[in-house]
């Protein structure tokens, strides 16, 4: 089977691009022919997605191949997907795209995207999302059904993350240096935390995971989210998590069971919970053990591979 993946990027600490890359790796392992389309873009904030879609569409029009499946990752990739010949078209999203645009740009821009979003979704034969909350929100917003397809955790990648010592009172932030991720909130309260914060915004994955494993906890202060892969990674590394109660975070972080949930944009509550957990070794151990069991039971390739192969084969 010949499959084409289209994504704005395939690298980074998290997000939909690395998700696409991990799926491509696994599919290749089991015999699928997966091609990654690489498209240039203009590295300016308001032009990245627009230039990606434009340059990609031009590239797509010149591609004379016919694929069994074209899989577009994120809404801007759909413009390219539309121009590629294939027997089946799949579009996957992390989060509600128009909502993300409004937070990062303006209500006017978001309004334009919202007016076209439903039509763009119609270009795909199958829609998927990694979050039940996004699945529900799109159902209410557009009436369209998204197949719930979680992003797996590849446990074999962690075999090289060994012999890492804990740094007492160290807290990790892993994610983009971007407004929707709430990094500004964590920076605002950093001086009130009874420990140090390591900000991992642009490091190689291996180095990021070593810092994460050496930390007492991971803090996810996002304003909006789908399902952060880094929470799954922290669970597997037995690093406790404090996350905001937004998007898909509660699908992973069960309050006072697999971690701690706090309201979004509540710096006082966030710093209180961080300091309380730093002082409570037993709670950290319990959350870490529960989370490790949860992630192995629900998000390994052993559990999810068949869902992915069914997506392409059906």
Name these PLM-found stretches:
Residues 69-71, 84-102, 128:
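Active-site proximal beta-strand in glycosyltransferases
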Residues 223:
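Aromatic "clamp/platform" in nucleotide-sugar-dependent glycosyltransferases that forms part
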Residues 240-243:
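Short hydrophobic beta-strand element within catalytic cores of glycosyltransferases
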Residues 255-256, 260-267, 276-281:
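Conserved acidic donor-binding segment of nucleotide-sugar-dependent glycosyltransferases
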């Amino acid at each position: 089977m010949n499959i084409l993946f289209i994504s704005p990027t395939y690298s980074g600490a998290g997000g939909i691009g690395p998700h696409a890359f991990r799926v491509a790796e696994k599919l290749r392992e089991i015999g699928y022919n997966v091609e990654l389309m690489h498209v240039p873009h203009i590295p300016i904030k308001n032009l990245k997605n627009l230039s990606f879609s434009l340059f990609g569409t031009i590239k797509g029009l010149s591609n004379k191949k016919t694929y069994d499946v074209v899989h577009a990752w994120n809404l801007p990739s759909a413009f390219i997907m539309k121009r590629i010949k294939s027997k089946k078209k799949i579009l996957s999203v992390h989060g509600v795209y128009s909502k993300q645009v409004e937070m990062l740009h303006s209500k006017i821009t978001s309004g334009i995207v919202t007016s076209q979003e439903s039509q763009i979704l119609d270009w795909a034969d199958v829609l998927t999302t990694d979050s039940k909350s996004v699945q529900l929100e799109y159902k209410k917003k557009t009436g369209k059904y998204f197949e719930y397809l979680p992003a797996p955790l590849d446990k074999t990648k962690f075999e090289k993350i060994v012999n890492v010592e804990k740094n007492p009172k160290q807290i990790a932030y892993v994610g983009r240096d971007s407004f929707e991720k709430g990094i500004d909130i964590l920076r605002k309260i950093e001086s009130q935390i009874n420990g140090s914060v390591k900000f991992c915004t642009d490091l190689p994955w291996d180095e990021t995971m070593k810092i994460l494993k050496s930390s007492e906890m991971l803090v996810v202060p996002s304003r909006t989210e789908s399902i952060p892969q880094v929470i799954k990674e922290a669970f597997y590394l037995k690093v406790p998590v404090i996350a905001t109660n937004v998007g898909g975070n509660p699908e992973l972080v069960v309050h006072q069971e697999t971690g701690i949930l706090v309201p979004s944009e509540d710096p006082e509550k966030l710093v209180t919970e961080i300091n309380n957990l730093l002082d409570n070794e037993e709670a950290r151990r319990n959350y870490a053990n529960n989370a490790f069991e949860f992630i192995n039971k629900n998000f390994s390739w052993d559990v999810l591979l068949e869902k992915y192969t069914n997506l392409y084969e059906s």
